[in-house]
Regions:
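Signature of dsDNA virion morphogenesis modules
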Residues: 1-184
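Charged/polar low-complexity intrinsically disordered segments, enriched in acidic residues
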Residues: 171-222
Length: 222
């Protein structure tokens, strides 16, 4: 079942490329598989199979998750005419963004910032429909994102990693609400399973005592 939208923003190898024939591009890997990520209150890993069958039909490329502005690029069904190309590999999801630096001032500024090293991070917004947890009762549980149902957008971000300013921290907290809800659900399921196990053990013990009592009565009647 799909849950709320989540975002992750970290430092990745973002590169600016220029080709006289084909224009200016930004390439990077916003989603990395099997990499342990410290989210502050838990450790998260994205499974190598997390993007199998994921909805990548309409993914936009933004700056700082600004959905009010004009997207700098877009992938529609990941066809060859899209201005953003997505490629799922054994290591994660790579992107190649074709920037219109001639007609779009934001695209030109972003390209310059990436080339200079001023902008070094990418973030992606996604929806998880399957995850699992380990060490759920500890202060630092471990989450595995088993499957992502949809990737909504990818953004270039200025503050990709911890520590962040209070504004980014607040934003990150909101983005992780879905993950926290998933953890609470896992903890509740564990508690319910333990309660059921305890009840089953109690009933089994009671039945065993009853059987022993019946056997004693039978023995006395013989």
């Amino acid at each position: 079942m799909d849950r709320g939208k989540e975002t992750r923003a970290f430092t990745f190898d973002v590169r600016a490329e220029e080709n006289e024939q084909h224009g200016t591009f930004i390439t990077g890997t916003p989603i990395v598989f099997e990499q342990k990520t410290d989210l502050g209150w838990c450790q998260e890993t994205i499974s190598r199979n997390a993007l199998n069958g994921t909805d990548l039909k309409d993914v936009r490329f933004l700056i700082g998750h600004d959905t009010t502005g004009i997207p700098l690029a877009r992938s529609r069904n990941n066809n060859e005419n899209s201005t953003m190309q997505l490629s799922v590999t054994e290591n994660g999801m790579d992107i190649r963004v074709d920037l219109d630096t001639e007609n779009n001032a934001e695209a030109k500024a972003l390209y310059s910032a990436v080339r200079r090293g001023d902008m070094s991070g990418m973030s992606f917004m996604f929806v998880v429909d399957k995850d699992s947890w380990d060490d759920v009762e500890s202060d630092y549980p471990k989450r595995t994102v088993e499957h992502i149902s949809r990737v909504i957008e990818v953004s270039a971000v200025a503050f990709p990693a911890y520590p962040q300013t209070s504004i980014q921290v607040a934003s990150e907290d909101a983005a992780l609400d879905s993950a926290r809800a998933s953890l609470e659900s896992a903890r509740k399921q564990l508690a319910e399973a333990r309660a059921k196990q305890a009840e089953d053990e109690r009933r089994t013990a009671a039945l065993e005592r009853l059987n022993n009592l019946v056997e004693e009565v039978k023995h006395e009647q013989v």
